[in-house]
Design a protein with these regions (language model features):
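Short, surface-exposed coil-to-beta transition loops
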Residues: 96-101, 112, 123-127
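Central antiparallel beta-sheet cores of small beta-barrel/beta-sandwich binding domains
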Residues: 51-108
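Exposed beta-sheet edge/beta-hairpin loop segments within beta-rich domains
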Residues: 18, 34, 103, 119-121
Length: 139
């Protein structure tokens, strides 16, 4: 597996803060076909050769799964391919970086994420399984 940074460094740095906040853009067009079927709540991302836990996230707006290294940053997105079972998005976050992410739908509680791009000028590659594991704390 290719990797620009280790999974442990990602988790330690807290780069997966994916809680939708006010002003976040909502899914439109081809994004809706798959993303509207995902359940909000507590999700866990696992990946790497040991299937290690990368992060736990409270997912409100599923579109944020398309920009995993840039969290809830205000980014522009271009859907380059989408159907009922997968989507590929190019995104750009001014001053932070950009990426290309493919999400493959398995169930409303399980998706596969494949993302790569630049984060503050440094390349990254992420391949992870995202699984809903319950309600968000305080929900």
């Amino acid at each position: 597996m290719r990797s620009g940074l280790s999974w442990r460094n990602w988790a330690a740095a807290g780069l997966f803060v994916l809680v939708a906040g006010p002003g976040q853009s909502q899914p439109t067009g081809g994004e809706r076909a798959m993303l509207t079927r995902l359940e909000a709540g507590q999700w866990e991302l696992r990946g790497g050769s040991a299937n290690a836990r990368i992060a736990a996230i409270c997912l409100g707006n599923p579109i944020l799964l398309t920009q995993p290294r840039h969290g809830a940053a205000p980014c522009t997105r271009d859907v380059v391919a989408a159907d009922a079972s997968s989507m590929t998005v190019n995104y750009s976050c001014p001053g932070l970086g950009r990426g290309r992410t493919t999400i493959r739908f398995e169930t409303p509680r399980l998706v596969q994420i494949d993302s790569q791009g630049l984060d503050h000028g440094r390349p990254f590659v992420l391949r992870a399984e995202a699984r809903r594991v319950g309600q968000c704390a305080g929900a």
